[in-house]
């Protein structure tokens, strides 16, 4: 993936995540531009470019699927959940006060 594609994905993800919140959207755009401008003179074959592009793609994915904004409507808040918002099944919450075992019966340290 090229840096230009990662830049565009990140800008679109910010627009989806912060739609309707012009102050936050503008700040996100400025931060994205600043981050890419700082690296604009780095050669394309530099070994630091691939991890930077991967990081930009991860941030874009996180913004699209995990950021939800709430707006105050009277005494309540309304969440702006969009089609890309990740929706969990909350299985662990449904268990109540039960103990959840992760990784089996291994003992830790000297216990």
Curated annotation (Swiss-Prot):
It comes from the Eukaryota. GO terms for cellular component: mitochondrial matrix. It is found in: Mitochondrion matrix. GO terms for molecular function: protein folding chaperone. Keywords: Chaperone, Mitochondrion, Transit peptide. GO terms for biological process: mitochondrial respiratory chain complex III assembly. The keyword Cell wall biogenesis/degradation does not apply. It holds the Pfam family Complex1_LYR. Interacts with RIP1. Belongs to the complex I LYR family. MZM1 subfamily. PANTHER family: COMPLEX III ASSEMBLY FACTOR LYRM7. Assembly factor required for Rieske Fe-S protein RIP1 incorporation into the cytochrome b-c1 (CIII) complex. Functions as a chaperone, binding to this subunit within the mitochondrial matrix and stabilizing it prior to its translocation and insertion into the late CIII dimeric intermediate within the mitochondrial inner membrane. Modulates the mitochondrial matrix zinc pool. This is Mitochondrial zinc maintenance protein 1, mitochondrial. It comes from Neurospora crassa (strain ATCC 24698 / 74-OR23-1A / CBS 708.71 / DSM 1257 / FGSC 987). The lineage of its organism: Eukaryota, Fungi, Dikarya, Ascomycota, Pezizomycotina. The gene is mzm1.
């Amino acid at each position: 993936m090229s840096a230009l594609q990662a830049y565009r994905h990140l800008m679109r993800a910010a627009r989806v995540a912060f739609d309707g919140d012009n102050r936050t959207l503008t700040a996100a755009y400025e931060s994205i531009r600043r981050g890419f401008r700082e690296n604009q003179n780095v050669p394309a074959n530099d070994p630091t470019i691939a991890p930077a592009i991967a990081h930009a793609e991860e941030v874009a994915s996180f913004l699209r699927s995990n950021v939800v904004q709430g707006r105050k409507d009277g005494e309540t808040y309304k969440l702006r959940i969009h089609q890309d918002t990740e929706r969990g099944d909350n299985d662990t919450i449904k268990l109540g006060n039960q103990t959840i075992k992760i990784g089996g019966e291994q003992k830790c340290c000297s216990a």
